[in-house]
Amino acid sequence: MERIKELRDLMSQSRTREILTKTTVDHMAIIKKYTSGRQEKNPALRMKWMMAMKYPITADKRIMEMIPERNEQGQTLWSKTNDAGSDRVMVSPLAVTWWNRNGPTTSTVHYPKVYKTYFEKVERLKHGTFGPVHFRNQVKIRRRVDINPGHADLSAKEAQDVIMEVVFPNEVGARILTSDSQLTITKEKKEELQDCKIAPLMVAYMLERELVRKTRFLPVAGGTSSVYIEVLHLTQGTCWEQMYTPGGEVRNDDVDQSLIIAARNIVRRATVSADPLASLLEMCHSTQIGGIRMVDILRQNPTEEQAVDICKAAMGLRISSSFSFGGFTFKRTSGSSIKREEEVLTGNLQTLKIRVHEGYEEFTMVGRRATAILRKATRRLIQLIVSGRDEQSIAEAIIVAMVFSQEDCMIKAVRGDLNFVNRANQRLNPMHQLLRHFQKDAKVLFQNWGIEPIDNVMGMIGILPDMTPNAEMSLRGIRVSKMGVDEYSSTERVVVSIDRFLRVRDQRGNVLLSPEEVSETQGTEKLTITYSSSMMWEINGPESVLVNTYQWIIRNWEMIKIQWSQNPTMLYNKMEFEPFQSLVPKAARAQYSGFVRTLFQQMRDVLGTFDTVQIIKLLPFAAAPPEQSRMQFSSLTVNVRGSGMRILVRGNSPVFNYNKATKRLTVLGKDAGSLTEDPDEGTAGVESAVLRGFLILGKEDKRYGPALSINELSNLAKGEKANVLIGQGDVVLVMKRKRDSSILTDSQTATKRIRMAIN
């Protein structure tokens, strides 16, 4: 009380008021604030008053030898006065101008190489086109984006080793360069930066920009690839956007885009094979994207997309803990639930077994074109706040949330039977059945959901069953917001497991991903994707299957040749022949196969009748389950180029053409590789193989009935005669031998005799 009284007395004197309002601030705390520590507290102000001085810069004494005291205009460039407290010289800003104009020059050859990312950015901006500015509300949502165009995808540790090896090769410290990309980059950079005079630290910083992906969590409306992010400040504000087309693409965006396409193709293909997981792994390991192994890219690339994450899970890599449903990424932000199987009845009285989530939970839902916040209890949607680019996108999000809520009125809104199947013709699980049903038509769902009056909340508006906005009424529990919902920012990755049907689960057993979640969108990859796996041959159509099948046979000929003679059944069952079957007319598959297998068996039985070209040509046809029949074929049909084309059993055709002189095979005009024939082949034809154990008597003799097929000869009794159809439709008369001993000589004499009989 005493002190307050004293202060009151002081304040009543006019002098006190004057001192407090007029005198300068020299309070110790203020002085301390602006003078303690090395950190500049007001850099802009400091710069202004420094630059107003005559000599704001200090430099090493050597500058006095390198720069004249005055410039051409007679202005002083440096002062002889020493800088207080150091033995440096005080220098004028004019000295910098003089140095830039008259100072020593150095080789500039390394600048574009070291500052490559900057030079490339300038080129992209120079060739980019900026369109009109539109003023409109921007729904931005924070997404994790790549802010560094043109980088390789090395991990921080891998990049560090490369940088040390390139910039400080003589420094001590263990560096292990293991991956192909590390070795390639190191070699390339060492060559580029020979005799480089740029400060090593600067080179190291710039290399880091080139090698490592840098991501930030930024508010974005629109394109998220790095060439758009680098101009984010030019293309979108709070209430405006400017159209922009980048003036060039960068490899990292192309890798991301191509990786997604490859992963989607592989997952779709694996789903329909007998063992999806094994097939998926085989394809991932044998695929290259832009010349780099897909598995290497998967290990380094942080892209989060359903198909990519399924491939990562299969390889045992960690993935994000969020889960996917209906093309939206769900992340639980609070609450918890237990799962229980429950049977429910649809509006069509079909029984569905669904896994019900019991308990209160909140989720964020993020899709490409819409985002939402969802609060739900057991089989009840409490609140959905959704925002999106347009009516359509908002409707998609609402359908997914309604199905996810598992509400009874949603299940009762089903009209008709649910029998959706996946690519492998297996029924989808009940939740995806419901989703597909309402994605096709959600009218009944929206009509039955119910509406309610709404309060006037800033930035929120109602939406009616016909998806029109409304200020008074809205679908029960559902509101549309002007603000987007941010993507989940954490980069945390969790250990997951995957079953053979490619369902990915977290350690609690929750399904995070399944092939049903993989988008059906088709795109054209920016980088070349090379699928070496036979399962992916059909992706480029029938011609590619044909060429690839024959290329594979030629590449593996040594192995195939042995199997052909020792274990043909195993050979016929090879998965590499699977795609080929789709080219053979369904009705003819079994007959062709039986015919070719018989032919091959005869070749095996008779010495000197092995024919490399013919085995290669006919082998794919033998893979189908065979049918024993008396059919003989002089040509086999394959469906390519939109119609049936013929492969001649003997001789060349546009489909299969072997050039004896060059020993090269062309399939549909494309080179399929070179063949090495066995030295002893090519003398005896298949005819001799056909006639093991028969004596050729001469030309056809009508008295012995119609010509038999090769298969039917086995029914003849010893000594019986018959006409037989051989080769290119020629018929000769034969007699079955009475003894077996002379079988081998038949094959040698048969060739000569047939020629005589035909001629």
From Swiss-Prot:
InterPro entries to which the protein is assigned, alphabetical: Flu_PB2_2nd, Flu_PB2_6th, Flu_PB2_C, Flu_PB2_CAP-bd, Flu_PB2_middle, Flu_PB2_N, INV_PB2, PB2_helical
Any one GO CC term of the record: virion component
Site entry: Avian adaptation: 627
Coiled-coil regions listed in the entry: none
Complex and partners: Influenza RNA polymerase is composed of three subunits: PB1, PB2 and PA. Interacts (via N-terminus) with PB1 (via C-terminus). Interacts with nucleoprotein NP (via N-terminus).
Primary gene name: PB2
Alphabetized UniProt keyword annotations: Cap snatching, Eukaryotic host gene expression shutoff by virus, Eukaryotic host transcription shutoff by virus, Host gene expression shutoff by virus, Host nucleus, Host-virus interaction, Inhibition of host RNA polymerase II by virus, mRNA capping, mRNA processing, Viral transcription, Virion
Main location: virion
Presence of the UniProt keyword ATP-binding in the record: no
BP GO annotations: 7-methylguanosine mRNA capping; cap snatching; DNA-templated transcription; symbiont-mediated suppression of host gene expression; symbiont-mediated suppression of host mRNA transcription via inhibition of RNA polymerase II activity; viral RNA genome replication
Motif (Nuclear localization signal): 736-739
Molecular function terms, GO-annotated: RNA binding; RNA-directed RNA polymerase activity
Source organism: Influenza A virus (strain A/Gull/Maryland/704/1977 H13N6)
Keyword check for tRNA processing: no
Name of the protein in its database record: Polymerase basic protein 2
Primary role: Plays an essential role in transcription initiation and cap-stealing mechanism, in which cellular capped pre-mRNAs are used to generate primers for viral transcription. Recognizes and binds the 7-methylguanosine-containing cap of the target pre-RNA which is subsequently cleaved after 10-13 nucleotides by the viral protein PA. Plays a role in the initiation of the viral genome replication and modulates the activity of the ribonucleoprotein (RNP) complex.
Subcellular location, record wording: Virion; Host nucleus
Family: Belongs to the influenza viruses PB2 family.
Pfam families: Flu_PB2_1st (PF20947), Flu_PB2_2nd (PF20948), Flu_PB2_3rd (PF20949), Flu_PB2_4th (PF20950), Flu_PB2_5th (PF00604), Flu_PB2_6th (PF20951), Flu_PB2_7th (PF20952)
